[in-house]
Amino acid sequence: MTETTSGPARGSRTKGTKATKGLRIERVHTTPGVHPYDEVVWERRDVVMTNWRDGSVNFEQRGVEFPDFWSVNAVNIVTSKYFRGAVGTPQRETGLKQLIDRIVKTYRKAGEEYKYFASPADAEIFEHELAYALLHQIFSFNSPVWFNVGTPQPQQVSACFILSVDDSMESILDWYKEEGMIFKGGSGAGLNLSRIRSSKELLSSGGNASGPVSFMRGADASAGTIKSGGATRRAAKMVILDVDHPDIEGFIETKVKEEEKIRALRDAGFDMDLGGDDITSVQYQNANNSVRVNDEFMRAVESGSAFGLRARMTGEIIEQVDAKALFRKMAQAAWACADPGIQYDDTINRWHTCPESGRINGSNPCSEYMHLDNTSCNLASLNLMKFLTDDGEGNQSFDVERFAKVVELVITAMDISICFADFPTQKIGENTRAFRQLGIGYANLGALLMATGHAYDSDGGRAIAGAISSLMTGTSYRRSAELAAVVGPYDGYARNAAPHNQVMRQHADANDTAVRMDDLDTPIWAAATETWQDVLRLGEKNGFRNAQASVIAPTGTIGLAMSCDTTGLEPDLALVKFKKLVGGGSMQIVNGTVPQALRRLGYQAEQIEAIVEHIAEHGNVLDAPGLKTEHYKVFDCAMGERSISAMGHVRMMAAIQPWISGALSKTVNMPESATVEEVEEIYFEAWKMGVKALAIYRDNCKVGQPLSAKTKEKEQDGIAEKTEDTIRAAVEKVIEYRPVRKRLPKGRPGITTSFTVGGAEGYMTANSYPDDGLGEVFLKMSKQGSTLAGMMDAFSIAVSVGLQYGVPLETYVSKFTNMRFEPAGMTDDPDVRMAQSIVDNIFRRLALDFLPFETRSALGIHSAEERQRHLDTGSYEQVIEEDELDVEGLAQSAPRQQIPAVPAAPAEIPAPKQAHTSAELVEMQLGISADAPLCFSCGTKMQRAGSCYICEGCGSTSGCS
């Protein structure tokens, strides 16, 4: 059983502190006497989620109740991920009202129990305002709140955990256990291994220690086992090692060596995709690795001097290394396989509010939560687009007052949750209640910047991002000080009062010196300045309720649940995305932020329409009619011909970091052509700019990329040189075999089939060889014009010629099934009820008519009869009953019946990459294939969200938020 601890809130009263009557809660969105649910229109939706790989239904719940303004994607994700109770039982939640009520009523009850509110009326306003904000997708708690709060199971509310490990076998085994329990609950954990003795140090018995890298192997295997044992997502974990640890070089090289193994196994034919069957044979694949560097090391890199590696037990230097060479080795490893990331230790601890209680040694897997060991953090994120006011004529402003009120509401709720929360270990429970770390943040920053006409990599964009961050964190600490006056400061505050208030002054000083740019950011800065003055005054008077207030998390699943265009602080992925439609199907749409930006930039309606049409057709703004070249940068995205530079991402992180208590979950994407020197530059400049942590990701650096065109890296010049004998030995006689076309006879059997796909009618004639399968296909569309008719004729000829030259039909089926474009939808074929396009329907029909059962079954294509048989018996294949035995005949001797061997089914042909998400759409348009795993739930390509991956289709995430 999972060990849990729970109890009354600690720090609710501090000796000598006079308690007030409680918080007065103001109405911001709600109306007295009217419940927020009564102000929206509700409708029933059917949620049916399928796996794009094989068409199987992953999840189905019909008749769920949601507001009419909720997107299909948000409804699907919230229903499948957050509704509690078994589907089909009376205990199953059936609507958003039940879900929100389960949470907000629990928060209200706990708030009243722990004396947060001045009166029952204030408690009611709190409940209504919280319900309104969740209902209208203004903010979202992290996933554990949606999973657990208000249910009979343990009330775990935290997504992020930091563990610790000491140099003893007992502690190391406890690490394995505690980490496993956290993974079992669907959360993530990180820790620093630097207390463990290196392999270069002696044990008390006289032998050499194993070293942390050795113990990482066991923890990695444990995480992989839990993942494969039925967890809802991959285990999320982080391992960190200090740069002065004697085993640092081995730590840096762990994933590089494993990546080389993966390449060798992949080239030998093994399935080494990130979700493949054979990936478990390699090590260290379940964790993010980071090196913790200090200022001493970075200055040694800058000067080119030596750096000392220190023994763990004595602290003495046992080895001197070239700092610049070690730094380059880190960059080379990150260039080769995206690990390790880097964390800047002195920068992190310079902003530490509780140094008297211990250093900050570790982080959560996504690197945004950084605080004391054996603590946790519960997250919440605000949807920034909800605070942008736009009159439709290009006049915009950021609603500063409403933003601050929502921040106060959310911080209050987050702090209340610590009072009733459960935790996976006793140590984590005690420390979290003693320090009450919170992690408020935001999503949709990239969309906000584009909508306001600001390039992501611009001074104006960075000014808005910094101003919002400053106001958010300042308001959070102000509310924390107000809470301290009501229910007391956190237990560790008395010991850390001086450093905590010093960090508050650092935030305020950074706010005062920030550069103001335009009419959008200036009012936000002004409000932030006033807020930080309140923080300093109230903090000195009351103390603070929370040791930490803000982080910027990836906001993967919750970002999609809020229908955000962008996650965390990320820029937009692309200008064109998929939108799911009510009733099924989807369509490609240009981001709604594009017309907003164009209006802000002064374009007229006719110009905007022409530019949007150009983007819809080409996927970018290059050569868009009437668009000024100086405005191109406003529409730069994470991917594409005009993608944001790597340093553009770093500059944005540096612009935000001074006003975030924790850190920022961010991966800096780099093109495949990036060099090791560029990685070094990013790591070095980020340190100088004051960033706390980052990771880089170079396109195509990992083997686990579906349909990667790369099969091996270029050999280094020294290795590439071959002697004359080697070249001579490699020369072999090559015999070239050319395919021969086998034409059909004059008279050939054929089948003509009519079909309807999404209302479009057509006819298919399939002619075959008398004895050898399909050899010709003709297609004709009804009432579709000469252009489409000509294209279908050309397509038919190309397929027919290929078949006659020997291209197997199953190859065409694997390539063209699941291809998605309009017209798509319902068909009149009982065996193919839904088609994603005309060619999807055609080749599914051809597979059913001409391919043997084993071949098409391997491709996931079955008839209606076979699907029904699978539901009834668990098998698609027809069971042939044996004839009744002749009992009398058994008395006679007879030859043993020979049972023919069943031929092995052909190897499954991988389905081609098709655009089922916005990430895949941009890949198809640009010919780029991003390194991202396929979603383990629905089979679509995932996309990056901070340092994690998120599935746009079903909301699954590889991270801990």
Curated annotation (Swiss-Prot):
Cofactor remark from the record: 5'-deoxyadenosylcobalamine (coenzyme B12).
The protein's required cofactors: adenosylcob(III)alamin
Pfam families to which the protein is assigned, alphabetical: Ribonuc_red_2_N, Ribonuc_red_lgC, TSCPD
Alphabetical UniProt keywords: Cobalamin, Cobalt, Disulfide bond, DNA synthesis, Nucleotide-binding, Oxidoreductase
Any Gene Ontology biological process: DNA biosynthetic process
CDD domains xref list: RNR_II_dimer (cd02888)
Tree of life domain: Bacteria
Enzyme class: oxidoreductase
Span list, region Disordered: 1-23
Ligand binding (substrate): S143, A159, C160, G188, N364, P365, C366, S367, E368, P554, T555, G556, T557, I558
SUPFAM superfamilies: PFL-like glycyl radical enzymes (SSF51998)
Catalyzed chemical reaction(s): a 2'-deoxyribonucleoside 5'-diphosphate + [thioredoxin]-disulfide + H2O = a ribonucleoside 5'-diphosphate + [thioredoxin]-dithiol
The EC number(s) this enzyme carries: 1.17.4.1
Active site: N364 (proton acceptor), C366 (cysteine radical intermediate), E368 (proton acceptor)
GO molecular-function terms, A-Z: cobalamin binding; cobalt ion binding; nucleotide binding; ribonucleoside-diphosphate reductase activity, thioredoxin disulfide as acceptor
Matching InterPro entries: RdRp_reductase_class-2, RNR_2_N, RNR_lg_C, RNR_NrdJ/NrdZ, TSCPD_dom
Family that this chain belongs to: Belongs to the ribonucleoside diphosphate reductase class-2 family.
Function, in words: Catalyzes the reduction of ribonucleotides to deoxyribonucleotides. May function to provide a pool of deoxyribonucleotide precursors for DNA repair during oxygen limitation and/or for immediate growth after restoration of oxygen.
Assembly and binders: Homotetramer.
Alphabetical list of NCBIfam families matching this protein: NrdJ_Z, PRK06556.1
Name of the protein described by the UniProt record: Vitamin B12-dependent ribonucleotide reductase
Species of origin: Streptomyces clavuligerus
